[in-house]
Amino acid sequence: MKELAMAALAAGGVCAADATGAFLPLTKGWDKTFPQSDKVEHAKVTFRNRFGITLAADVYKPVGSRVPRDRHPAIAVSGPFGAVKEQSSGLYAQTLAERGFLTIAFDPSFTGESGGTPRYVASPDINTEDFQAAVDYLISRDDVDVDKIGILGICGWGGLAINAAAVDTRVKATVASTMYDMTRVTANGYFDKEDSAAARQAKKEAMNAQRIKDFKSGTYELGGGVVDPLPADAPQFVKDYYAYYKTPRGYHARSLNSNGGWNKTSALSFINAKLLAYAGEIENAVMVLHGEKAHSRYFGEDAFKMLKGENKELVIVPGASHCDLYDGGGKGAIPFDRIEAFYRKNLK
């Protein structure tokens, strides 16, 4: 456990070494976009993935838990794509801990407080591994029931969670909330409007030209986060992203979407991949959760069609947009009762 969990601290600061020997300075105190619950104990931890990258995470567990008497069902949470653990994933994790689960919300490789260079890059392989490394960490804890582990991915991490569930048989239950299939949207554009060889060729040429530029400059140019200033004619879902990432509601200084965004060549890893290729082989339970009015709803519904078995659920939240399922949208849109019931049923 000492090798996997590099450091933990309930309050104050902590440093942990990544694979390069550099130290990760973790923040002191509470810096989330949501209030701290008095029903939950919180601690900072770090652990390494299979690629040697050190990930930073927040652990949440019910107040009053005692080891070894209390071994909790556990859930690893991450997302949205381009967010940090202080945003939506932390809210999900803390809320589920209030309901009796031990949870972790982690920053993916190359982002937030986690290690890895270059910064602000995504990878379908490494980011799937991030979920699996979180499972490794949970299994190492004395207060976790190792046969009752689930994962929860939000937005682009919903698709990655399904991919992780397809390869990691230790994951007994998976929730994909307001999910994106990042490989599909990268290759085909929104609503599959760029689903042609010519369109993909143009994207590849642009990204490879950027590779040359980055190599020569020795830096990685960022693509920009959520558009700012917001154009008056922006699509509603872009306005919704702005309302979350660019306002006090969800802004965080370490969030890519709130600031400079991913590096421009990051999409190269996704454009030729098929993230959900083996979704139909997942034997354990999966819930796909989406808002009725979400622009991304088609990702979730199409993913659900790939799943097989009686232990798969599709939940459409009436009136909810994509971003309403980040933090409830001020109207309690996240169906935590339904999520809890799903995990209770399947983590047993």
Stretches found by the model and what they are:
Residues 23-70:
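N-terminal cap/lid segment of alpha/beta-hydrolase-fold proteins
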Residues 162-247:
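Alpha/beta-hydrolase-fold enzymes
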Residues 282, 288-290:
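Short beta-strand/loop motif that positions the catalytic acidic residue
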Residues 95-115:
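Conserved alpha/beta-hydrolase
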Residues 143-155:
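Alpha/beta-hydrolase fold nucleophile elbow
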Residues 121-142:
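Alpha/beta-hydrolase active-site loop
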Residues 71, 82-94, 108, 300:
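The serine-hydrolase catalytic nucleophile loop
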Residues 320-333:
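Catalytic histidine-centered segment of alpha/beta-hydrolase-like enzymes
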